[in-house]
């Protein structure tokens, strides 16, 4: 496939009008011998790397802390529709029971066959409960805890190793 006339973000951190060829899952900046049906005129459009969202709680009426694979499906589908290719949704500072449910639902979601129209699930951003009371922002005070490696390990095990970021 050949994408023609796109404004491509380059190594020099500027956009320039270029063609992008790709085949067998690999991109190239050299033209291919593609048929007209295998080319796309991207005049006036920008080609950028896929975006990675490492901190968001929810969207479109769904929240990561809803604790269901279905909620994650809605988050991943929406994020992909706006150019995000990978997500690392953030928890809130919630009860141990709720956090455990969130971790289990993330594991269940991640182990399922995922539709190609969803952003990839890169992991979990655990925003709390190990945060400072003085820097809590919108986090619930009643669920803030001191750092606890045993509790973290329990959650990490429940998630199947998906916790990638921990806010403290």
Feature-to-residue mapping (PLM):
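Histidine-rich, glycine-flanked metal-binding segment
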Residues: 1-4, 8-48
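Short secondary-structure boundary/capping elements
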Residues: 43, 67-71, 144-151
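Di-metal (Zn2+ and/or Mg2+/Mn2+) metal-binding site signature of metallo-dependent hydrolases
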Residues: 45-67
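Divalent metal-dependent hydrolysis catalytic cores, especially in the metallo-beta-lactamase
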Residues: 57, 73-102, 118-132, 159-168
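A general structural detector for well-ordered alpha-helical segments in enzyme core domains, enriched
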Residues: 71, 75, 102-106, 151-155
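Short, electropositive alpha-helical surface patch
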Residues: 100-115
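Histidine/acidic residue-rich metal-binding segments in metalloenzymes
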Residues: 109, 146-168
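Glycine-rich phosphate-binding loop of ATP-grasp-fold ATP-dependent ligases
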Residues: 134-144
């Amino acid at each position: 496939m050949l994408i023609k006339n796109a404004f491509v973000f380059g190594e020099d951190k500027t956009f320039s009008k270029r063609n992008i060829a790709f085949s067998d899952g690999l991109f190239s900046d050299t033209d291919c011998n593609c048929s007209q049906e295998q080319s796309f005129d991207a005049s006036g459009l920008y080609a950028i790397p896929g975006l990675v969202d490492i901190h968001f709680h929810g969207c479109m009426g769904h929240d990561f802390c809803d604790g269901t694979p279905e909620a994650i499906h809605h988050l991943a589908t929406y994020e992909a529709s706006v150019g995000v290719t990978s997500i690392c949704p953030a928890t809130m500072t919630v009860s141990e029971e709720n956090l455990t449910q969130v971790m289990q639902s993330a594991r269940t979601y991640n182990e399922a066959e995922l539709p190609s129209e969803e952003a990839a699930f890169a992991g979990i951003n655990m925003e709390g409960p190990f945060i400072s009371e003085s820097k809590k922002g919108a986090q619930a005070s009643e669920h803030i805890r001191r750092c606890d490696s045993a509790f973290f390990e329990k959650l990490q095990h429940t998630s199947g190793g998906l916790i990638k970021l921990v806010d403290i």
